[in-house]
Amino acid sequence: MAEESVPSGSLLSLDPELQKDFQQKVHEIRRKSQVGAVSPGVIYIGHIPRALYEPQLREYFSQFGTVTRLRLSRSKKTGNSKGYAYVEFECDEVAKIVADTMNNYLFCERLLKCEFVPPEKVHPRLFIGCTAKFRKPTKPAVSRYNKRRSEAEQKKMTQRMLSKENKVRKRLAEKGIDYDFPGFAARRERKEPTCDADTSVSSQDPTPVCTPTVLERRKSVRLEQNDEDDDDGEVVLKLPQEDEEVVLKLPLKVTPTAKRQKISKSEKKTKIKKQK
């Protein structure tokens, strides 16, 4: 079979067997566009390879017709492609042909998914900002963390964090999971009452209280602290009888060991001779 001659400048179908039908449809679309105004058409493209971005997609789909607008979905945090995009053609008939032709087309080891989106389902804000040049965010998490927030923004942020925490706690309670974790809300520490709070003063160690009632109760109580040395500087307390006064006997000179001056050997010998 002789190969059919294809005029230069005409579009080529992906399937050579359907080249005639494809050219007829394109010819009809171009004739209609010359006669009257045409309505634009939008297609959805899924399973896009990672290597394709806005310039590559626009260049590839421009072979079917005039591409007026293109929107590739990207991540706000990283700026990478999410794998799907929306392309608007000047004519809706061209968009339908592209959706039928490129659906389930193997491209870079991926099957492209193309669907025609009806005009009533196209969101009015779908292509906002599509003409601006994309700039990949640099350290978005750091800039977001170091951002100076106003009082209203801080209040809104704390309310959002507390609401998320309450939702997590409710979800755990609904599933019957008894699990507690420290949250964002500040909690006051509760002071637990001691077990000796209800005990009387008489059960505690004796103190030198000079009231007649206490002295009468503690006539037979005596506190003595046995020390290895008598000159250690410790207080020896003895509770008196009825008519005696409380006297605290302290040593005349109490000097801490750390502050004592060092005595030389010669001074020690002179002191010993004087004592003799």
Swiss-Prot record:
Keywords: Nucleus, RNA-binding. Residues 190-211, 256-276 are annotated as: Disordered. GO terms for cellular component: nucleolus. The keyword Lipid metabolism does not apply. It is found in: Nucleus, Nucleolus. It comes from the Eukaryota. Coiled coil: none annotated. It holds the Pfam family RRM_1. PROSITE patterns: RRM. Residues 41-119 form the RRM domain. GO terms for molecular function: RNA binding. The keyword Nucleus applies. Residues 197-206 have a biased composition (Polar residues). This is MKI67 FHA domain-interacting nucleolar phosphoprotein-like.
